[in-house]
Amino acid sequence: MLELLKKVLKPVAPSGLEEPVAAVIREEVAPYVDSIETDALGNLICVKNGTEANSEKIMLSAHMDHIGYIVTGIEKEGFLRVTNVGGISPTMSLTRHVSFPNGVQGVVVSEVSKDTAMKDLFVDIGAQDKADAETMVQIGDVCVYANDCFQLGANRVASPAMDDRAACALLIRFLQTVGATKQTIIAVFSVQEEVGCRGAKVASFAKAPDKGIAIDVTAWGDTPGTKQPDIKLGEG
């Protein structure tokens, strides 16, 4: 399971550019489902037919996209001005390593400010000036927190893309191991969740399941200073 998780975590796939991770998932699940399609929005929809005629349809959904930044401008010194794609905390972004789909790497830094806001952030990609930066990145390009995946202790893993690639890996493994079911299983690996749950909404209307379950990460209550919700890592 750990190797599968690492494989799914690796692709750079911000909201709207999920194709790299969709390709990995398609390869993993193809032998275990009856049909696979990619809809117009980019959702990867995998169907495992039920054994009963007119069987109940159950949709299981996990999103493939990752929060990130979109380049909004390039300074004369070569620094990239950015804004958020999805929910990002400016203060938690400082000094974070980011990756662009074309392989360019950068670091998020900020203007000197008492209260860091998104408008204060920029990305340093090591460019000498604006012209140099434009050979590597263009306005409108998107980057994500780099896949710095590593193990914590014996059985825990940390990575910026665990939301929601952990659920993608779980759904993949479910399809690989579930066997025959009375119900028809519709597994949706959805796009653009971080910018408004767009993919899951489209897939839900298109497939009209009888029941739906979203698989995602959530807040926690087992670290210093937190009490709610009553959720602990490793306890289900």
Predicted regions and their residues:
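N-terminal hydrophobic/helix-forming segments and targeting peptides
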Residues: 1-236
